[in-house]
Amino acid sequence: MKEGSFVELSEYKHLIEEMQSAVDDFRGSLDLDALNESIQENEARMAEPGFWDDQAAAQKVIDENNVLKGKYDTFKQLADEVGDLAVAYELLSEEPDAEMQAEFETDFQHAEHDLQQYRLNLLLDGPYDRNNAILEIHPGAGGTESQDWGAMLLRMYTRWAASHNFKVETVDYQAGDEAGIKSVTLLISGHNAYGYLRSEKGVHRLVRISPFDAAGRRHTSFASVDVMPELDDTVDVDIRPEDLKIDVYRASGAGGQHVNKTSSAVRITHVPTGIVVASQAQRSQLQNRQTALNMLRAKLYEREEEKKAKERAAIQGEQMDIGWGSQIRSYVFHPYTMVKDHRTNYESHHGQAVMDGDLDPFMDAYLQWKLAQRNPQ
């Protein structure tokens, strides 16, 4: 083998070390011993004589064990794959061989792909990450400026969803006074929609030269984004009819156009918490009522989960004011262009691409950040 080829091969050493480091991180976050212990406990239960007496409970144990075994086996396979690569590299370093290197490079590409896929599966392992997402945008104080910023975010998320072939349904839409929106609620349907979009929850800050300011001054606007998983009926949320205040009104679409001429839109207020949800996307009042109730269930569930998380001191700063110092991400278009996430420090100088829906790098960085929090070094 020529010296130039060996230099090329030597570059793999650092890449393989990075792979091994990633595998070690995964091992730490998985806790293989506890995982294996849970598998053995389940298998012991499955071997008991009366295991099938309660078929529903038995199936639940089997399903849970399949998930655990899948996690364990997939990790072991990945660790072996990366280990084999390291051995192959050492052999090639000692005895260069063109045919063996070609095979090594193919194996490396496969391992790289498997590692990325495993990382994604590990990051999106929350109980509702695979669910559809309910996404709300609420502009902050600032009138037309903030309402226009809300509309820009609406376009950004719609473009992002389209790039993933996700379905977007506008559940509720309140148009701005002169431009933009006062609020909007979207149902974004697709595999892992909530898992990705939960990274977007928080306050988003815009700095730009205002198109609404004749003097061409720089303005700062804020909008909050809330994201919840769409829940099915198996998730138990206690909603008492006497706690609900239900109003009906005439639905109106973007631009103020009436969707229909009957009072089919429904707004529900949960009196004990003050949570308000609304739906005007469906054709009938009954359908809108059900959609609104589903959103209320999601919000109440989210509220309870946040309460538990705060009690465990696992979440900080979830309740934020729409204002200075509380934003998760800044979008600066003057005097320079940069979009920066303040949690992960990931940034992009391609502001227009981000506004066109190029959010995956930000979402990936957030998921990696969350994993690092679970597995501190």
Curated annotation (Swiss-Prot):
GO molecular function, one term: translation release factor activity, codon specific
Keywords assigned by UniProt, alphabetized: Cytoplasm, Methylation, Protein biosynthesis
GO CC terms in record: cytoplasm
A GO biological process held by the record: viral translational frameshifting
Protein origin, superkingdom: Bacteria
Pfam family membership, one: PCRF
Post-translational modification: Methylated by PrmC. Methylation increases the termination efficiency of RF2.
Compartments, record wording: Cytoplasm
Residues where N5-methylglutamine is found: 257
HAMAP family to which the protein is assigned, alphabetical: Rel_fac_2 (MF_00094)
Family: Belongs to the prokaryotic/mitochondrial release factor family.
Stated role: Peptide chain release factor 2 directs the termination of translation in response to the peptide chain termination codons UGA and UAA.
Remarks, miscellaneous: The gene for this protein contains a UGA in-frame termination codon after Leu-30; a naturally occurring frameshift enables complete translation of RF-2. This provides a mechanism for the protein to regulate its own production.
Stated name of the protein: Peptide chain release factor 2
Taxonomic source organism: Lactiplantibacillus plantarum (strain ATCC BAA-793 / NCIMB 8826 / WCFS1)
Lineage of the organism: Bacteria, Bacillati, Bacillota, Bacilli, Lactobacillales
Encoding gene, per UniProt annotation: prfB
